[in-house]
């Protein structure tokens, strides 16, 4: 009986988690109409795997006046999406400080579902920015304060958008800019070369990726003076994604005159989300101060 009740509760939680996702496109680009194998599991954290149909969940901070909006890309090595502690939980925090949030359920790269799997997540991120600006009036969003945020591989996706916003991969409405106004990256994968997270690279590009593609997705190589301002957080003892990823990205940003701030923890490892339990210091508070300093919020 207890096992039955536990199963029902788990299913109920999962239904609540997924009921809010809306279609990202009218017609999905770069898509093979194969059986949808999306699945989910709760094992300490909520994970979504095999996403082939992208979606979004919009969390409103109120409709009294236009507010900033952050698009959140959960991490998961381009294999799964940690959609709760790196997604919906973060969205609720942003709402508490007067920022709308959109959690992006981006596609997991798959040869079964995409003719060109390596660009599918970037297409979804570009579309998400476009969508927010399309609905700016209805959703009470300030279209000049639309940011992108990502954790781990989601940070790679977010930074890919930040440096490749001018390489349009979608055909929805090219009159609307897909350039984010700011970026927030949590223990991000940045480079696909020296400091690469091999799993993320293989899942996105495949085992036989070319040097040109690895360079394209080594985002520190594509920073320029028009790259959006950035806030990053990383722990020195991260054994999954070395902190050097954040170091080289911040160096590239500052070398190009782009405002960037890196919050460094001595410990914390990888995947701590909003709260690093090994430290009394709050990177979330530092991020809020950074948002205020850059006049994104008051």
Q: Which residue ranges define each predicted feature?
A:
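N-terminal cap/lid segment of alpha/beta-hydrolase-fold proteins
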Residues: 20-64
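Short beta-strand/loop motif that positions the catalytic acidic residue
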Residues: 231-234, 238
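Mobile cap/lid helix-loop segments that gate and shape the active-site cleft of serine hydrolases
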Residues: 43, 188-222
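Short amphipathic alpha-helix adjacent to the substrate-entry channel of hydrolases
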Residues: 84-102
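Catalytic nucleophile-loop/oxyanion-hole region of alpha/beta-hydrolase
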Residues: 82-83, 89, 106-143, 276-282
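Short beta-strand element of the alpha/beta-hydrolase
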Residues: 67-75
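C-terminal catalytic histidine-bearing segment of alpha/beta-hydrolase fold enzymes
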Residues: 247-298
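Primarily recognizes the serine-hydrolase "nucleophile elbow" in alpha/beta-hydrolase
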Residues: 127-197, 214
């Amino acid at each position: 009986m207890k096992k039955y009740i536990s199963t029902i509760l788990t299913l109920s939680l999962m239904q609540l988690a997924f009921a809010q996702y809306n279609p990202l496109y009218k017609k999905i680009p770069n898509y093979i109409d194969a059986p949808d194998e999306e699945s989910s599991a709760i094992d300490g954290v909520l994970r979504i795997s095999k996403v082939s149909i992208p979606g979004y969940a919009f969390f409103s901070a109120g409709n009294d006046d236009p507010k900033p909006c952050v698009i959140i890309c959960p991490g998961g090595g381009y294999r799964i999406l940690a959609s709760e502690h790196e997604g919906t939980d973060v969205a609720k925090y942003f709402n508490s400080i007067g920022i709308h949030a959109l959690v992006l359920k981006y596609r997991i790269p798959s040869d079964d579902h995409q003719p060109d799997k390596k660009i599918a997540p970037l297409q979804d991120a570009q579309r998400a920015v476009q969508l927010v600006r399309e609905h700016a009036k209805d959703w009470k969003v300030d279209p000049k304060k639309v940011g992108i945020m990502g954790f781990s591989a989601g940070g790679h996706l977010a930074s890919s958008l930040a440096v490749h916003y001018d390489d349009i991969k979608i055909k929805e409405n090219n009159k609307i800019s897909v350039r984010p106004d700011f970026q927030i990256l949590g223990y991000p994968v940045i480079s696909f070369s020296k400091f690469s997270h091999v799993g993320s690279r293989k899942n996105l590009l495949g085992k036989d990726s070319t040097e040109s593609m690895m360079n394209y997705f080594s985002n520190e190589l594509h920073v320029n003076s028009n790259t959006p301002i950035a806030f990053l957080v990383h722990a020195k003892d991260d054994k999954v994604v070395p902190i050097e990823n954040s170091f080289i990205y911040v160096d590239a940003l500052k070398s190009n005159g782009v405002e960037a701030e890196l919050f460094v923890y001595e410990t914390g490892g990888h995947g701590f989300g909003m709260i690093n339990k090994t430290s009394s210091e709050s990177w979330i508070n530092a991020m809020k101060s950074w948002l205020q300093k850059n006049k994104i919020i008051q």
